[in-house]
Amino acid sequence: MGCCTLGLFADSVEKRAAKDVFTEPARFYPSQKSTLESARSDTSESENASSSVPSHSQQELAPDSAAPARNSVLSPAPPERREKQGTAVHGAEVTRAGAVSPRFVGGLTKILAASDHTFFAAGNDGFLTQYTYPDYKPDTWQITPVSIKHCAVHPDRARIAVYETDGRNYHRVSVWNWRTKEILFAKRFTASVVSLSWIVQGSFLSVGTASREGVTVLDGSGNTVSLFSEEPGVVLLTASGPRLVLSYAESGRLTYVDYSKKTTVKRLLTEKNLLSPMLIHNGAHLVGYRDQRVYVIQSSSGAVLTEYPARSACFAHTFSDSLPVWIEPAELKYHWRIRKAAQRSADFMLPDNARITSACSVRTRVIVGTDRGILYELQQGDDRRVTIRALNGERQIYASDVHGADEGAYFLADGSLYHSMASGGPYRVLVRGVKGTRFLPYRDGFIVWSAGKETEFLHCAQKTSQHRMIYRARSTVSGVSVYGRMLVITEPFSGVSVVDIERGIRVFFHKAIGMQDSLLITDDVIVATQSGLQPLVLLHMRTGETYTQRWEAICLGVRAHDTQHVYFFSLDTNAGTTDLIHFVCNCSNPQKVLCDASSLIRMRI
């Protein structure tokens, strides 16, 4: 949904006719020192307390000076040096950019122009990447583990607001300093966010939500401010000029608000339920899609100026373009075309039958994102043929588990165990064909298992790459540790097992429900945590005795520095604190195991 900086609202709309509201040329009103920046030092504590960041949000920046409306795409471009190799794909030549960045896993969700030579791309994998024309050098940062759906670039170009969601009940908007990769503030919402835009020269952030209120306005510190005197409905687009704020709601209501007086200046009714509404022609026209038609509406009156038949519309125009530009599917399956009003390019097809999910314009090019996570640069020639260049696509490896090594680290990904040097450089494969998602280093190989139910524990030898089954768990595994040649396995619905790795035989089993984690600290003594009033317990393998330790908190995880020093997290729900506890075990007298316990770190929860 659209957002932009609008500089052509009339100075005194109440005294002018509706047809004169948008007669002034567009101007970009540079942001003064934003309230966001000035409030940051005063509100750093509250910002840090707020937790982590993302559909269609239009270009934030208008030209720095008055300029007539123009079209930035579908015009002949100056010749540039390109890679000679290419593959013709149904009327399109596909080449690859020199600087290649990884693809977005799960697909692209949003492309947003930040200036006439830079743009942001966001994906379902939580990655946000800034690309700079003409080499498209990427600057990438993962700001969330969930999907990014909306973005809005601040007029100072240093800050970006994003909406992140898991598609169910997690909805959060956060603002980031892109240059330092620091979060400035974040706010959770109970309903999904449908639009995101900076208004009033970047002083406020407008968040349109699918709630009864319809829109929430935040100041530079993330605090809610009152801007609308009445609920405008579900707001799909918000823009502002030097004095007025314009909002478009899905009900078709156009509302003008004087933000200095917080009063409604004018209300209009126009086409309702427009998808991806955006402003063009320096704010004079509102563009949106509905029912196989692209509508061009006069912003000052709400009147429909033009309708264009369209099979669908993924808009790619800029704020100053005089005509709408969009990508639509062609008649043939997996084929696409570029539209500029009634004009159309030759049909083209993307590799891998990719589906276009987002688009924007940079200089004379159209940048599109796909459901395969690949970005493409589209350029139309005089013959209407479209030249295609892939901007990313390197394969990424996602590690399911990582452990430190003497030099570098081991990690497990895509069924293989790798080693990466601390100095960087290429990683090397140690063991292939691994069936599991978790592992522990063990002597000349690794112990591998999966986090699911009834998992097999395998010993994978590094030199021979042979896999040998050690043990099969009967229920979900919550904790695994190695002591010498003994493997300690904790199953919450079964108990604690100790398995001889070399022989593949279980040598000890403590049957109990609610075990959380366990650690063998001597040849005979196991320290374990369990749910209940006495969460800390010692198990003696040789005698079979159990020693419960009174602890007025919940114990989470146990780890040992050596055979005597044990660490665990203690969660006190009454006091609202979490402590990292260190204690020295007196294994000759297990009943005095907590004779030396101290809190190393205390965290308030």
From Swiss-Prot:
Residues 22-93 are annotated as: Disordered. Residues 46-57 have a biased composition (Low complexity). Gene3D superfamilies: YVTN repeat-like/Quinoprotein amine dehydrogenase (2.130.10.10). It comes from the Bacteria. This is Uncharacterized protein TP_0598.
